[in-house]
Amino acid sequence: MGKQMKGDKMKCKCKMAVAFLLILVMLVPLSFSCGGGGGGGKVTVTVGFLTDFTGPGGPAIAKLYPVIQDLVQYYNDEELIPDAKVRLISYDTAMDTAKYIPGYDWLKERGAKLIITSLPGGVETVKPFAGRDGIPIFSYLYDEAMMEPPGAEWVFSITTPSKLEGKTLLNWVSKSHWDYTQGVPKLGFYDWETSDGIDRQAAIEEYCQAHPDEFDLVGSFLVPSGTMSPTGEAQELKDCDYIFAINTQGAYFMKTYRDSGYHAQFLGACSTFGFYEFFKSMLGWEKLDGYTTTMLLPWWDEENAAAVFIKEFIDRYHPGKSPEDMGASYYGAFYDTLAVFEILQQAVTDVGAANLDGQALRDAGVKYSLDQAGLPEYGFTDTVRYLVHGVAVYEWSAESEGLARLSDWIPFIE
């Protein structure tokens, strides 16, 4: 963990009084605000969240947002940021791209020192302004366009590139899963035509071209976002051995495919875990059985130090609740979000709360690393702007109605 979060803090040797979750304490048009004010002579440090509460991403954000709120309260309760209180303000774009820049401006005008975002395309839209203003942007998403100038030097992705995940999973399947006495497996790919889908498709096609003895890519489809009944694509891929299908679009495809009586094994990505509840309700465990995905965290049933800490944290702020109660988005985003607060903590330690600015946050960000038992390598450098540097492979199991680990942590295949 970071400076204050390992040792005594990680082992929760601090006083473990049960705390009530700070809910939205101020409501204004298109915005939400919570967190401490500047009590006791402390400097108020404002964190902005540019997101989608009421649009298509709203259900997922409803599960993710509490982890940000809880970490704000945790850092304030434990006074982990010297001489400072953290305040969280949020702007709801409803995933309307016309509101991305006004939302950024709204957060900036109210003093946000850094901005967290969950918006597809949001970073590409606001990063030129963030570069101009010196405000670091921390994104739950990653795509190549985020890392292109202008403004890319102020961008941190608190996840991992889909292209590296895809290549690493294919490499694992070829070495550890497929029986080549059956010949070269037929591979298919299906996704919506988003920046992430384009990146992932390019990575899969590149890997297959470089390794024709490992996979025969027989079909690769990008369809318009929102497609829910991909019957034509399902038929085209009916004879595949493996098919990449992820997130909401993957669930629609998998249901169409299974309902048509086809039998390929599905491959997924860590982001799929954020839609865990949706997959269960859409498909049920019988149709999900065998779905093989990468993960950035240990499954919550494991007695793993990283998983145990999240469960203890949940019990502190939501007594009696389990990770499953809180939702996959909460659990899956915990260490990603924690990284933002550890970077904030280090920046304030370096320059003082009264002197905190975007440059201090950026400087702390590029030096950040996390050494936590039970996790892959986490960290940034001046040139590497994605947080997580490895995955484990898991299989969704109808028998256990959970996820079964198939591998240790695997470094990425470039």
Predicted regions mapped to residue ranges:
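Short, low-complexity disordered leader/linker segments with a strong preference
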Residues: 1-46, 77, 109, 412-414
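Beta-alpha junction/loop-to-helix N-cap segments that form part of ligand/metal-binding clefts
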Residues: 36-42, 59-66, 78-149, 158, ...
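Extracytoplasmic "Venus flytrap"
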Residues: 48-69, 91-98, 120, 190-199, ...
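Periplasmic-binding protein-like
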Residues: 49, 107-120, 138-140, 186-191, ...
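Venus flytrap/periplasmic-binding-protein-like
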Residues: 93, 137-139, 144-147, 225, ...
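Extracellular/periplasmic Venus flytrap/periplasmic-binding protein
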Residues: 146, 153-260, 301-302, 308
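Extracellular/periplasmic periplasmic-binding protein-like sensory domains
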Residues: 257-334, 412
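Segments of small-molecule ligand-sensing domains
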Residues: 318-330, 341-402
